[in-house]
Amino acid sequence: MSASDTHISCASLAFSWPDGSEVFTGFDLTVGPGRTGLIGLNGCGKSTLLRLIAGELAPQEGVITVRGELGHLPQTLALDTALRVDEVLGIADRRAALDAVESGDVRDGHFEVIGDDWDIEERSLATLDGLGLGHIGLDRTIGEMSGGECVLLRLAALLLDRPGVLLLDEPTNNLDAYARRRLYDAVDAWTGALLVVSHDRELLERVDRIADLREGSVTWYGGNLSAYEEALAVEQEAAQRMVRAAESDVQRQKRELAAAHVTLARRKRYGQKMWDTKREPKVVMGQRKRAAQVSAGKHRILHTERLAAAEERLDEAESAVREDEEIRIELPGTRVHPGGEVLLLRDPVPSYGPSLRGELMVRGPERIALTGRNGAGKTALLRTIAGDLTPLSGEVSPLVATGFLPQRLDVLDDASSVVRNVARSAPGSTDNAVRARLARFLFKGAAADRPAGTLSGGERFRATLATLLLADPAPRLLLLDEPTNSLDLASVRRLTEALEAYEGALIVASHDVPFLESIGITRWLRLDGELRDTTAEAVRAGG
């Protein structure tokens, strides 16, 4: 089948989880050849949709059609650490048969296993090399590889099968800059139908179209992420104009209805006066009264219907406006004076991971990006600075109050409400003060009383961020470990907004260069056994 014939079709899908939570109802989607980026808020059903298309889940209603061999790279990989590379690639049996034939064993069974794949080892090594894995060979085990290498290996297995349809679910989450570059190259070279769920801006700039999943349906936008954002901004500006016009119409209809009531009341008083003074025959006045009542009723109904229609148009206009509120906070307690000493590192050796040579003194409100290949020790270093780990040797001396946002958002007590979680980190604040500040993080009213365990991914992130930033004492050194890994685009934007208000020093371990640039990084460091200065350009190139 040629690449131009590949496609995915979902017709009238309905899917709910066993607890009754509805994900899709009457859902339709068609994806043709080319690269499609699927975006949407955390929890809207993106990963569920990919699992439905892959056949891992079954819809309660509807039909899914896939033309072309299908490959699926899920967000979470479950690989046995004892598996060898050739087993993950699915070529171990053919390698064994090739070895047997080369050793002189010419039984028919070996030829049946090999089929036409006499060059399978060469093709496998070439595929690995194309993804930057040429160094691992075919006999290494999963347990000897990093998380990023495992993701690329699983992608290599899919590419080796030459599928016509490829599903990728947050493929860059655990990849370092070098591995991301290799994955971007694979996406650029793709010719079949590709559907990728991602919040990675660089990856989404490479797609041909954007499918925006929102409230159980998809809206299509031609072009990459930048084109989508431009089109959405135009749409939202038009929607806001429609709302303002509809609001104006509602107010006008209310005024006209009120004026009509006043006019009818005056006519009623005049008619009663005519009746009381008997200026005309009773029969004539009775006819006029009945006609006036009919006319008044019609007039009232007409204006009431016009008001109802105007209110309906307002509801429709408001439904087109996205309620993407911004985080607007002030954090004066986090201020660090220029030149003030914040952190001293000297040849730190964390209790796990590689040791690091070199010295670092953080002064003032520096914003430092911590980069390096997977396994270079970024997480171990941050945990050591935060006090979660004790250094085996060297000096690790935070000189100000420190806050740490780990990769896993396990800072919150799931059984406690959002407001109680924040109150625990700021024991000197009143309940009203905590609630007022939480509102700036978009937890207003009853939302602040929800148990942390019931929050969506984006909500949980905001609550965790609030717990850290609203702490007493306020953190004047903030450590973030891959903060954008599990966030949708809206949550990444809100993190950026919150960090705009942060006035302390910042150390961020991340491979997400666009995010790092958006938060105003002032110094780029690379870990490779030493603490080395680098540049954004070098990090973007995978260096």
Residue positions per predicted region:
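ABC-family P-loop ATPase nucleotide-binding domains
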Residues: 79-147, 407-477, 482
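Coupling and communication elements adjacent to P-loop NTPase active sites across diverse families
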Residues: 1-16, 94-151, 234-352
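Conserved beta-strand-loop-alpha-helix hinge in the C-terminal portion
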Residues: 82-87, 216-241, 527-543
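Catalytic Walker B motif of ABC-type/P-loop ATPase nucleotide-binding domains
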Residues: 166-170, 175, 405, 477-482, ...
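Conserved beta-strand
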Residues: 10-13, 20-34, 62, 345-364, ...
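Hydrophobic anchor residue at the start of the ABC signature
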Residues: 155, 183, 465
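Conserved H-loop
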Residues: 200-206, 227, 410-411, 513-518
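ABC ATPase nucleotide-binding domain signature region
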Residues: 35-36, 48-109, 364-432, 511, ...
